[in-house]
């Protein structure tokens, strides 16, 4: 059994969850509060069936004990796995006529779009003048540069609210500073 758990480290991913999940007995997994206390960072093992559908298994305390006994830095490994799965940081974008980004959407088929906002070190390179993040659904992360016009901001806010209203796992219709949702000591910052 421990060999299977050790092998699962290659499929370990960080997952941002709403804190209401923690209040239910359905989410009895290791987690870390994020600076914005409505959200937490947890971890899951990703599985894909032969048809490519993704399913998750919550990390258990037993898994953590085995990884730590083997000297595996499991949180660092989850961060690395997320980066490797994010060769394309976003899947969709809207550009201005000058080629600058109005918004970038992380809606990868693995369902970890919201978790990709943890890649702040890499996102900072694309948005050196700053940006906001949004997580209308657990599977969607959105990056919005700080220099939007009022019209662009309204259009973006309307988009966020629409996605939030139809989300399968709703998170928030609001914009946040990246530091609100990334742990201070996160592993690539």
Model features per residue range: what roles?
Residues 90-93, 133, 171-174:
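Flexible, glycine/charged-enriched surface loops at secondary-structure junctions
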């Amino acid at each position: 059994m421990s060999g299977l758990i050790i092998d699962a480290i290659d499929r370990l991913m960080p997952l941002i969850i709403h804190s209401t999940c923690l209040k239910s007995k359905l989410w009895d997994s290791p987690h870390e509060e994020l600076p914005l206390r409505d959200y937490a960072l947890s971890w899951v093992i990703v599985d894909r069936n032969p048809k490519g559908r993704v399913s998750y298994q919550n990390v258990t305390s037993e898994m953590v004990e085995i990884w730590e006994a083997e000297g595996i830095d499991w949180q660092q490994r989850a961060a690395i796995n997320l980066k490797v799965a994010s060769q394309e940081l976003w899947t969709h974008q809207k550009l201005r006529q000058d080629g600058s980004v109005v918004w970038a959407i992380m809606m990868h088929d693995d369902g970890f779009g919201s978790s990709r906002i943890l890649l702040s070190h890499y996102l900072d390179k694309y948005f050196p003048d700053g940006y906001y993040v949004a997580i209308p659904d657990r599977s969607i992360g959105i990056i919005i540069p700080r220099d939007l016009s009022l019209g662009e901001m309204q259009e973006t806010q309307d988009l966020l609210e629409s996605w939030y209203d139809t989300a399968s796992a709703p998170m928030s219709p609001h914009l946040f500073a990246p530091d609100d949702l990334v742990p201070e000591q996160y592993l690539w910052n």
